[in-house]
Amino acid sequence: MLQPSNRKYRKDFKGRNRGVASRGNRVSFGEFGLKATECARITARQLEAARRTIARHIKRGGKITIRIFPDKPITKKPLEVRQGKGKGSVEYWVALVQPGRMIFEIEGVDEALAREAFNRAAAKLPLKCLFVKRTVM
């Protein structure tokens, strides 16, 4: 599972996930990409499940690049504990994703295989995604 190795502070404020992605919104490392079309918090487990799905579908061919990293800790207090007494412990890690952000990229496979792999991976993620091809500038 992906998570930061060390941080200055263990816990974060909740924050808000708004706006559109101004960075990481182009296919940079591969030929095809899976692009987010809405805001979401993607957990490290969801990201790993989607990555495994892509890897299984494309088998030995191709290279997968993960363009997001779960670097935000989400805390939770234990069940049946009263409010107060400080913030809960870190339960899992998420990546905040805005519309337009590239999540995965693939290179070295044909378009039909990449499209099918991304469709299966998108089913594991909590947001709507779009299949995109690299545009040469």
Swiss-Prot record:
GO BP annotations listed: translation
Q: What are the annotated disulfide bridges? A: none
Keyword annotations of the record: Ribonucleoprotein, Ribosomal protein, RNA-binding, rRNA-binding, tRNA-binding
Query: Which Gene3D superfamilies does the protein's record reference?
Result: Ribosomal protein L10e/L16 (3.90.1170.10)
Residue numbers spanned by region Disordered: 1-20
Entries under CDD domains matching the protein: Ribosomal_L16_L10e
GO cellular component terms, alphabetically, are: cytosolic large ribosomal subunit
UniProt feature, compositional bias: Basic residues: 7-17
> What assembly does the database describe for this protein?
Part of the 50S ribosomal subunit.
Summarize the protein's role: Binds 23S rRNA and is also seen to make contacts with the A and possibly P site tRNAs.
Q: What is this protein called?
A: Large ribosomal subunit protein uL16
Q: Specify the species.
A: Coxiella burnetii (strain CbuK_Q154)
What taxonomic lineage is listed for the species of origin?
Bacteria, Pseudomonadati, Pseudomonadota, Gammaproteobacteria, Legionellales
